[in-house]
Regions:
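Hydrophobic beta-strand segments of well-ordered beta-sheets in folded domains
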Residues: 1-4, 79
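Short glycine-rich His-centered loop
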Residues: 3-23
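Short secondary-structure boundary micro-motifs
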Residues: 18-19, 28, 148-150
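Short catalytic helix/loop segments, enriched in acidic residues and glycine
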Residues: 21-36
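Radical SAM [4Fe-4S] cluster-binding motif and immediate context
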Residues: 24, 184-185
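Glycine-rich beta-alpha loop elements in corrinoid/cobalamin-binding modules
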Residues: 35, 39, 44-183
Length: 185
């Protein structure tokens, strides 16, 4: 099963006319990809920071959408995960989720990060293009979600810790039990 992981572009400069040219891959996505790979899933990473830094700085949102569509066509994933580290990236994350759904209406979209962790119910209530929200650390959550989708078993969603979703009737369900990863040291 294939999972496309997306890190949105983050301009860390106050002066938006100044752009960094030394972005590194998203550590969060690398951790998620490692967990997926260790559990026999096929992750593909799209770090839009690197895509934007090297081209189309002035029209980044449209360029990012183009990169996402190309990645969907190339990867043909079963699940798309989008990192939303900062609240400032949330509007773009919603645009990217909408881009995914416009391209592939049945594609499942999960988001995670600090902003979604703080507002899972509000996001699922107001954002029809987001299907799932990882709450807190997402490494175990993404693996459990991928397994549920692979098995085509929605009942498994209720067992995923630190996770929010809409059930088959559209009701929002939030599993608040904490899901900590093992110490990395």
């Amino acid at each position: 099963m294939k999972v496309l992981l997306i890190a949105p572009y983050v301009n860390l400069n106050v002066d938006s006319s100044v752009y960094r040219e030394d972005f590194y891959p998203s550590a969060a996505l690398l951790h998620l990809a490692a967990m997926l790979r260790a559990n026999n899933f096929e992750p593909t990473l799209v770090d839009l920071n690197n895509a934007v830094v090297h081209s189309h700085k002035d029209k980044y949102l449209e360029y990012c959408k183009k990169v996402i569509i190309e990645s969907l066509n190339e990867c043909k994933p079963d699940l798309v995960g989008i990192n939303c580290l900062f609240s400032g990236t949330f509007p773009d994350v919603l645009e990217f989720a909408k881009t995914v759904k416009n391209h592939s209406p049945d594609m499942k979209v999960a988001i995670g990060g600090i902003h979604p962790t703080s507002f899972p119910k509000e996001i699922l209530t107001n954002c029809k293009d987001v299907d799932y929200v990882a709450i807190g650390e997402g490494e175990n959550t993404i693996v459990a979600l991928a397994a549920s989708i692979k098995e085509k078993n929605e009942k498994l969603l209720s067992y995923i810790k630190s996770f929010a979703y809409r059930d088959k009737d559209g009701a929002i369900r939030i599993n608040r039990e904490k899901n900590y990863i093992d110490d990395l040291d």
